[in-house]
Structure formats: structure tokens, C-alpha cells
């Protein structure tokens, strides 16, 4: 029987032999290669499918021991810890220097096109198939494409590798010589030892080099005054240098922290029942906080983080330099939020202040398994408490719950705190930042997905051509009536059937260009440059945050031009998310004066003069504000009030607070605002004489800030003591417990103990949540009055909350507290257990009142929504606000108008599901005459028009949940499809994602979701395109999105300009790419007619190799990057041009087939024109050689073919300027240059000096010109006819722009605007009302409206100009004038007539 030592030794050697084998098993499993049963079992054991495996244990809750030995249940048979924890060394790079080449090549050849071309290279290396071609030369195109991609991947990965190295070698403080029982004995393989030696030598070498550089810098020192203002960006070399210098500095100091680092430590207090220090244990004195690298930190280690240092791993806070155990962190690296957040140390660790106390700690932590939720952590810290009772020493286990409030996550930065001592619970890939760093859902653009169909079609054509060649060639060899039977040495294969097979594969090699090898890399290059253009668009740069529109996914820019549905959050997306407390209701009395944007919108709909009404309201509010401030100053001197920042205006409130309306109302006002000053989680920060509140929610900051302004000031919080000053009187409340807010609970509660020793629970939340928790049969009239006030507030566009309280006895509290502590200490399902316990105490509440907060619209939102609607895009708003609030915001932002028929889908919970389905069916039939059948849904998929009616649907979240979960999805979707606007209110993040998924999958349309908060991430990732706004709630949405912008108004240009351009560019580019491949390949096919279809080359092989790679790629790439039919201004002024993208007219398959047929026709001309002309003429060079040799014929055919292809591409471009024409000329010249230079080489054999012979003959130039004209004239004639008699919308707009008619329209509009009365302001496209200004904002230039019914170009404002078009739009205006080319103006748009789009007729 093996000893424990032998087993331990065997286990240490185990990784050395199994590591490689397991990697092979994993690779085979990913490739779906069947594994043997033994291999499958071994893989599952070490990969975690088996719960008892090393990695499987990692997925279970973990228990970590500190100063205590591991129990037997945590040990294996060798005495080692069962658990395996990942190293803290992380790697975000895809490759290492060793595996880059094989891994990158393996990933690239997962692309089917690359595999196909690799197959061709292998075929050509076999002499029977590729005897005419050098295999090395045949591999050049594939090597170039793979090489370019590899270089691009290497550049991208190099940066990640450098950042990984820098991060892993960041120094931190770890308790050295501490016996950590949680870590298994680590086996270091020979390879890792080798790497460590190499790294050590590398560091020594760099250190010596740095010493030389430092000495040289000292010798060549520059005076300080000469260096003033000089600043350089850090390089990777400087990053390494700083890392190695830091290492040397702390190694020179033996890694010990100087005593000065412990200045300001917390005073050691007397031991209490919950204390993790064993004061009877003796410290060895060998443990010190020694500097080490992040990569060496392990689970179970004590670490010490200093001020402004980054957190190396996920750690539980044991103590901090603050006497109350408070520390502050910045979480910008995790969620993008820059405001500081407060964290609290465990109360049981308040005496842990130095190395000795850490060494004497005796406790264990029960932790949940690692997961990616950044906002949740459940754990418990437990230890033994010894007590002497009845003369015997007994031990009792005590516990303290651990939540996220006591955690520091890797990536956060410690701020405003001298030091923090903590213990590591998660390292490396188990940390939350790494679990959240996984790649977002892979999104491929629609054109890219549809590209497979084009490729498959070309494969079918390719194999058909090869099959024809194989059959005909086999038949030809079988017959004896041809001269080849007598002059050839026999068939290659030995029989007609084998000859056919050989010819088939030789044909695959010959016609390979039909599947363009450079297509995918060209598309990737084009989309990368398009993303760069988007990023550098100054019109989408948000100056306030210094943030440009940032593409995160570079491969879906063309999808932006096909969006049909936009799903938008409201708060922070349409609004500013800057909350202003405007009104409140207290004890049935409403307070506050305000004139909101929604109120202005209602006045406008009622036909009132909003300008005059605004002046009246503002004048009244200003007088009331001055009166209120004067009354408050007389009541008490509030030094924290800044007069200009006061948003809650109500002199009546101060009057009632002073008791002039009775003692009852005065007490109610006092309790209401004192509750606001206590029920929160904000941090008070003193800035001079002012107090500024930092909160995770802008609503909470507004509530506490208004309480401060009216005299109820929250001063500070130390541990569990909240200090307030109410009307000048300082009070201290003990915070007993906080029940946090969550999106599921929709409420928050605190329990405080007042100066009079009374226990009070204060609860704030949504009105529907609070009202159902009030004391039954109490405050009946107050409930009705408050509900009416809240309804009015919501109609005014304000966000509402309710405040309530409950007084508790000490017995009630501690009875509940016992249950709450059990729930709070639970490792699993803690949230659900806390919710159950919270329901016990958050009941029988007494209503105090309600608040109303205004969230103003962002600048430009109404204009942007109007533009998107005119473009044919449907906008749905998904918000968590009340229905009334959402409706009024909808009116304010032009989503709704007074003429709409509102369908409010809000029913009681008592209504059963069958009854709800009847109601939904009634709505659908009554308004639209539909039954909700599957056939109607299929018809709806093909209908992309804007709903013709004037209906708007508003649905509540509770009803929406039942609709989405039941069989009513089809009826609901049809109802929404027929409505011009849809508002979903009171919805959860999951419901937002479900709505997006329903529309996207059921209607098969392009969807875009836009939001600004973490609750929008699910919706953003579910949509085809996700757009995140960098806002007040952090950058969680922006980090998860495909595009990040600063304001909603930038969305209109992103979609209507860049999206439309990129869609047109990519669609046209793909069609032209396949067109040129067809032209080139079929010229080779026609040659086979005169060659027994034996798959011989017409061209020199270099032509075949370079055609798609060099000769014809540049014009197509320029088209994909640079082309635009109209400029950005016209794209925004005439948003109806966007509808072609929604209908996918430019990427329709019939358009693709048209290009293929055009290429087929041109291939006939290119080959037969040259062949038939030359075949009937005998020509000879000066040396007497007949120039009709096959290589010379190849030049005769290749030259016009390449010229035709390049000219055809630029003819399809809409925008001609010096740049595009220059690149077109460069592409053409490469052919002439290559032919002239390459044919001078002796190694070209029969091709030797072909250029010098052929280019001297006039026949060649006659054939060249004739072929180009014959190929392109039908296309030019078709384009001219289409634009003259069946012009598209864009053709009319471009012609109007060219003939200055749009400029004349602008001038007439300006004249009419000056003469126009204010009545026109009722237009839905007017500039949004700004209540803060003294008058209505000046209207901007109106977008043009293209009326396709009357087929005239009209403006949205009254005018007398209506252009009429003669049969010749371009009469008297040359198409290709030098002036236009020099200015880079736009050429008339090319296109083809589509039956799906009704062309505009004169």
C-alpha cells in the first residue's frame, strides 16, 4: 500500500504528465471529435462536470480558514487541501509568443473560404492537377491574406499582452511567512521554471541597461527650467522600467513596510463577543507585510492596500485606517462610475491593525461560489467565542454576515483612506471583473450573414463549370476524330472517366477566382475604416464629457442603415437624469410651484400661447421663491442653503412648517422631511462651507438635497450613527438596519433609533408598492387625496415616490432582527430570504406623503425622434416610470401628439388570463379588424410601412408580463405593429429584453436598443445593435453596447447618416466584388470552348493570382470606405431616404443576380470581341513570331477585362472626386506596370517580352477601346434612362441640390419663417420647449419631407415653392464637369429599377 508521501509525490508529478493530455482532450471535444470513455471521464473530472473534481469543487460554495487547520472533510488522502483555486495571474490576450503562429492559423482556417483556398493550394502541389503552376506561386494569395490577418491580430494582441504583463507585475502588500492552509502544494513545471529563469535574466539585463541610461541621463542632464511644461506619453518600455524599478526598490528594502506606513492606525479597542483575534495566541514576529506582485497573491492571504492603490483581488475588508472602519473606493474600471463609494469593514475585525494581530486571527469565512454579478455577494465570517459558565469552558460560534458593502473588488481603486487590511476570497479568473470581461454576444451584420448565400451560389456555378469541363473533356478524349488523338501522348488519367475527374479538379483551380479570396479581408478593412470615421465625427462629440461616439463592435456598421425598430429607455436616455425636486404632498396638502416641459406641452396642445404663459409662470415662481427664502431665513439660519440651487419652491410649505396652519400639519411637514434626511444611502461630502451629497441614484441625491435646503440637513454618518440638523437642532439617530433598494423590491427601508429611544422604520418606494403595505382601513381619505396628487404630478411629467413609516417596539424589532440576521447570513438565496423577512416588518405602514421630481429632456430629443419617425423607424419607449409620467414625456418629446387615439392597456391583477386575452383580442379587432392569426403575423413581417393610423399603445409592466408569458404574444405583437407609438411602463430589465427579443425574432426586423444604465444592458445585448449613453448612472450600458454616445440626439446622425452611408457602401461593394469575379472567371471558361474544355489557362498565372488581390480590389475598397450619394446635411434634412435600407433594396438578392448577369454579359464581350477580331487577322512581330500565341491572347483579353471591371466599379460610385479617381487610375496602372515589368523576365518563358510585342500593335488598342465601350455602354444607357424617366428619391434630391433648387427652397423658408405668426409652432417638428428660458427657443432649419403620395418635394413648413420636374432633369448641366470633379461634388446616383420601390415620376 502506498504511503501518504508517495501519493503526495505522485500527485505533484501528475500535472507534468496530464496537462498536455488534458489540453488535447479539450481541443478534441471543442472540435466535436469523439472521445474514448476513459478520456471523457478524465476530462470531466478535471474540468468540473464532476462536482467532486478539482474544478468542480471550485464551482461550489467555499470555506476559507484563517489561523485554523483545515478540517478532515477539506483534505484529500495525501493531506493536501481538496480545493483548487486559480492563480491571480490573468491573461486576456488570445495568444502567447509560443502558440501565436499555430493558434492564429488554426483560427483563421476555421473560415470556410480559407479552407477552400488551402485545398486549392494542395491540389496545385500535385503535378497531375497543377503541372502548369508553381505551387509556391499558387500559395502567394493565401499567404498574403493570412499574413495580413495575422499581423493585424498580432498588433491587437500585443497591446493586451503588454497590459497583462504590467498588471500581473503590479506590486502590492501581502503578509509574508503566514501559514495559509487553504492552498494546495503548488507544483512548478519545468516549463514554468524555465520561463522564470528567462524572465529573471531578462530583468537583470534590462536593469543593467537602465543603469546605463540613467548614468547617461545624469551626464546629459537638462536644466529644470528648460524642461518646464514638457510632457510625454508613457511607452511600454517605460511601463516595464517602472515595474522593474519598483521591484528593485522594495527588494533592496527587504520587502518590509516602514513603520511610518502604519501612522494613523485605528486604536485597539477592548475585545467584544464577536472578535476574530485570539488574544491568548502568541505572534511569532516573523510575519510582515512584504511587497510582492499581484500574480503571487493567493486565496486566503492577508493583504494591505494603501491609498490610491488598485485592489489586486476580490477581498473582504477586515479593517481600515478609519476608526469607524470606513473606506472609499472608485469603481470606474468596473462600471464606469467616477463617484466614490463607501465600504465598511467587518465589525469583528476592528482590532486587526498590524501584522501581529493578523497572525493571531482565528476565524473562517463561508463564501458563495464566484459569479459575475457586480452588485451582489453573500458570505459570513464566523469564529469561536469562549465563555466560562458553571465552571466549564465552552465555545460558541458567532457569525457576522458579509455583503458587497464589505468587499473590495479587483480593479477598484482605494481613495481617501490611508490603508485597508483584508483577506483574499477570489483570485484571477474567479474575480468579478474577470467574470464580467467575457466577450459580449457575437453579432454579425445582416449583409455578412446573407453573404453565405452569395458564396454558395458561386460555389454552385463553379462546380457546374467544372462539371461541364470534366464531361466534355472526357468525351473528347474518348473520340478518335480529333487531331489530338494523333499528336498527344495519351490521356492524363488513363481513361475518359479518370480524365474527367482530373479535369474537374483542375477546373476548380482554374476558376477559383469565382469565390473571391480577398472579399472577407476587404470587408474587414472597410468596416474598420468606417468605424474610424464614426469615431472622428466631430458632430457626435459630447464636449461636456469629452466623449466621442465610440464604436465597440466594428463589424456591424452597415446594420445601422437597416434599423426599423428602436427601443429606448427614458430616464437618462431621453431625459438628462439630472433630478430636480419640484413638488410634494404631505398629509393631504400639495406643495410646490413649477412649470415643467410636460405642462408646456399640454398648454401647446390646448392651443394656448405658450410663450406668454411661460413668462407668467416664471414671474410667479420667482416671486414665490424670494418669499420662501425670506420666510426660511426668518425661521432659522440654514447656512447650507444656496439660494440659486433651490428647486422646491413653495412659500406655503414654510408657512405650514412654522405652524400657522395648525400643529398637526406642522408636525407632518417636520416628519416628512426628517424622513427624507434619514432614509437613504448617500455620502455627505463637505466642500468648504457646503455639503454635497454623493449617491448612486440621482433621485436619492435630489431628495436628501431638498431636505437640506429646507432645513433638514444630513450632516454625516459614522458607522451606525447618523447626524442630522433639523431646523438648527442637531440630532443623532442610531441606524439599526438598512434594507436595500432593488429593482425587484422597488423600495428601500431604514430602521433608526431616535434620541427618545423610539424605533422607527422609514420606507420609501413606488406608490403602488407603498400603498399595498399601508395599515388596512386606516388613512382612507388621505390615501385618496395623495393618490390624486400623485396622479396630477405624473400628468405634469414628474417622477413620483411615496414615503411611509412604522413605529416599532423594542421587542418587535429584536424579534424581527433575529430572523433578519439569519437571512442576511445565508450563503444561498440570501436575497429571497431577506425579501421574505422584510415583508414581515414593511407592513402596517403609516403614509407620510409623496414626492415629485422632474427629469428634464435632453437637448435635441424631440427633433431626433421626429427625424427618426420620418425615416420610417418605429420608436418604442420602455421605462420604469408610471403610465401618466411616461405619457406626458411622450408628448414632450414628439413621440405622441394630440391627434393620436390612445390605447391604454392597464387592467387589474384580479382579471384572469382568459379575460385578458379577450380584452386584447377586442382591442385588435375593434381598432384594426384583425383576429391575431399566424397568417396575419406572416403578412405583417412583409409590411415595413409606417402605420397609417394614429393610434398609440400604452401598457403597464404587470400586464406586459402576463402577455409575454402567455399565448397572447402574437396578438400583442400585431397590436403594437399597427400603432405609431408604443410605451411600456413599469417594466423590469428582463421585460425590456423580452420585448426586444419578441419583435426581433417574430417580425424578423433590424432592432436597435439604447439605454444608459445597468438595467438596460440585457436589452442592449439582445438587440441587433446596442447603443449605450454615457450618463449620470455610470457607463455600464456604454461598456456593454456596440456603440457608445454622449447624448440621444447623436443617434439621428449615427443612424441616418453613417448607418445609411455604410449600408449603401457595403451592399454596393459586395455586389461589385462578385460581379468582377464573374467577369474574370467566365472569360477563362469561354476559352475552354476552343481548348476541348481541358482546363487550360488563358492568362499568365500571375494575372489569375493578382486579379482579386491587386488589380481590381482598390476601387471596390474605395467604394466601401468613401462613397456617399448625398452629404450629411441632406441625409438629415430628408430622412425619408433612409427607407431603402429598411426595405433592404440595395442588398436584395435580385440586385445581386442583376450584377451577376451583367458580369456574364461583359465576360462574353471581353473574350469574344478580342478572340474573334484577332482570330481573323494574322499578325507577326518583328522577329516573325505570330502574336496569336496563347499568352499574347491572354494579354489581349486581360487588359480590357481589367479596365472594364475597374471602370464599371467607379461608374457605380455616387461620389467622384480627385481622390477616388486617382485611386482608380492607380489600380489600372498596376496592371500595365506589372505586365511591362514582369514580361521582361526570362523566367516567364512564353510570356517573355509579350508586352513589348503587343503594346506596339494598333490592333490591341483598337480591341481595348472597342471592348470597354461595348461592355459599359448598356450599363450607362440603362442608368441614364432610369434617372430620366424612373428616378429614385435620391436622384431627385441630388438633382435638386445640383440645380440649386434646394438652396432656393431654404431662402424662401427663411423669408416665410420671418413673416410667419407663432401659430405654426404647433408643428410636430418644432424645437422643444425650454421652461428655463424666457421665451420659446428659436426654431431650427426644418427637415424636408418627401411626400411619396403626391410625388413632390415638400417642406414641413408652409411655403409656395413646389418643384416640378421636366423629363430631362440634367438639361443644360453637364454630368462630368471638371468643376464638379475638382470640388468633389456628388454625381448622379446609379441604381436599378426595383418593383419593391415605386419610382418617382415627373
Swiss-Prot record:
The keyword Cell membrane is assigned to this record: yes
Membrane spanning stretches: 109-129, 135-155, 457-477, 501-521, 1066-1086, 1101-1121, 1151-1171, 1193-1213, 1218-1238, 1260-1280
Keyword annotations of the record: ATP-binding, Cell membrane, Endoplasmic reticulum, Lipid transport, Magnesium, Membrane, Metal-binding, Nucleotide-binding, Phosphoprotein, Translocase, Transmembrane, Transmembrane helix, Transport
Residues binding Mg(2+): 569, 571, 1012, 1016
Cross-referenced SUPFAM superfamilies: Calcium ATPase, transduction domain A (SSF81653), Calcium ATPase, transmembrane domain M (SSF81665), HAD-like (SSF56784), Metal cation-transporting ATPase, ATP-binding domain N (SSF81660)
Chain sites annotated for binding ATP: 569-571, 700, 741, 743, 746, 764, 799-800, 879-881, 986, 992, 1015-1016
Alphabetized GO MF terms: ATP binding; ATP hydrolysis activity; ATPase-coupled intramembrane lipid transporter activity; glycosylceramide flippase activity; magnesium ion binding; phosphatidylcholine flippase activity; phosphatidylcholine floppase activity; phosphatidylethanolamine flippase activity
Cofactor(s) of this protein: Mg(2+)
Location in or out of the cell: Cell membrane; Endoplasmic reticulum membrane
Superkingdom of origin: Eukaryota
Membrane topology: Multi-pass membrane protein
InterPro entries, alphabetized: ATPase_P-typ_cyto_dom_N (IPR023299), ATPase_P-typ_P_site (IPR018303), ATPase_P-typ_TM_dom_sf (IPR023298), ATPase_P-typ_transduc_dom_A_sf (IPR008250), HAD-like_sf (IPR036412), HAD_sf (IPR023214), P-type_ATPase_IV (IPR006539), P-type_ATPase_N (IPR032631)
Signal peptide start-end: none
EC number from the UniProt entry: 7.6.2.1
An annotated GO cellular component: endoplasmic reticulum membrane
Function summary: Catalytic component of a P4-ATPase flippase complex which catalyzes the hydrolysis of ATP coupled to the transport of glucosylceramide, phosphatidylcholine, phosphatidylethanolamine, and small amounts of phosphatidylserine from the lumenal to the cytosolic leaflet of the cell membrane and ensures the maintenance of asymmetric distribution of phospholipids.
Stored NCBIfam families: ATPase-Plipid, ATPase_P-type
PANTHER family in alphabetical order: PHOSPHOLIPID-TRANSPORTING ATPASE DNF1-RELATED, PROBABLE PHOSPHOLIPID-TRANSPORTING ATPASE
Protein known as: Phospholipid-transporting ATPase dnf2
Organism whose genome encodes this protein: Schizosaccharomyces pombe (strain 972 / ATCC 24843) (Fission yeast)
Gene name as annotated: dnf2
